[in-house]
Regions:
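PRPP-associated nucleotide enzymes
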Residues: 1-149
């Protein structure tokens, strides 16, 4: 692991942490000056669980969630978020719900689509879209449009 990475811990939950690296990084669509390494949060269950608990706090008492749409390999975080939001022991608006966690597919042009077996989990539901980062917002806007369609 590069020694220049710095641990960034949540003030709400010190167990929820990510690594970041300052510098100049370019993608085909954007330039950023901080790289945030989300790989451990997305793949290690302890990191994902703590991150999900911290993220879910923002939605517990004010947002009903029926479905979580996971973008960019955030399914593990999404599953733990669903568990936290549906937990009947907290004051969640979604307590007791069987929250669906789905991942969209992409066609050959890059359009987001939901197969028939997932559409019933989207249509007429309260949907939370989860992503690991948002440099331009293009993918998130595509996801919003697909959910609303």
């Amino acid at each position: 692991m590069d020694e220049r990475f710095v641990d960034l811990r949540s003030t709400k939950n010190p167990k929820a942490r990510i690594k970041m690296l300052s510098g100049h990084f370019a993608t085909k669509n954007s330039h950023v000056n901080t790289y945030i390494d989300m790989s451990t949060v997305k793949t290690r269950h302890n990191n994902a669980r703590e991150t999900a608990r911290t993220l879910a706090e923002e939605y517990l008492t004010n947002t009903m969630v029926d479905t979580i749409v996971c973008l960019k390999n955030t399914e593990v975080i999404g599953a733990f978020m669903a568990e936290t939001l549906a937990d009947s022991s907290n004051m969640s608006m979604s307590a007791g719900n069987n929250i669906s966690v789905v991942t969209p597919e992409f066609d050959f042009t890059g359009q987001i689509l939901f197969r028939e077996n997932s559409q019933r989990m989207i249509e007429g539901k309260q949907v939370l879209i989860l992503t690991d980062s948002m440099a331009t917002g293009t993918l998130t806007m595509q996801a919003i449009e697909s959910v609303l369609y």
